[in-house]
Amino acid sequence: MNITKFLNKVYFAPRLKEIEQYAPLPLQESFDNAGVQVGDVNQPATGALLCLDVTGEVVDEAIEMGCNLIVSHHPLAFKAFKSLTGSTYIERCMMKACKYDLVIYAAHTNLDNAAGGVNFRLAELIGLENVRVLSPQKGALLK
């Protein structure tokens, strides 16, 4: 989905902060890697592509559509790289994103755990009542 008009003549950082106000990064699980995966958030936005998973095809589509922001639910990389050589699929996606000045941003378990986030919305859609947190995160208000 191209939301170019929404992002026209704005910078990423303030828009990404809006996402993080709704789904704060501290709500992510310890295994997760939500937030900016790669890219310079201080560049002007040309458009955004939303996806569930970042793939090579998604990166190519963003480039073809002139979108320099990819917002994904699942992170492209869950762990830090020791080197970036292009020897793996994920590394090649990251390198191509860098080459074309793309920003990749993931809102994963922080969005799942947010009040009104994915899990709350799914519960609402299937008609659950009295929805409550089953296992609160230590130091967090919601899970």
Task: Name these PLM-found stretches.
Residues 1-143:
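Hydrophobic structural segments
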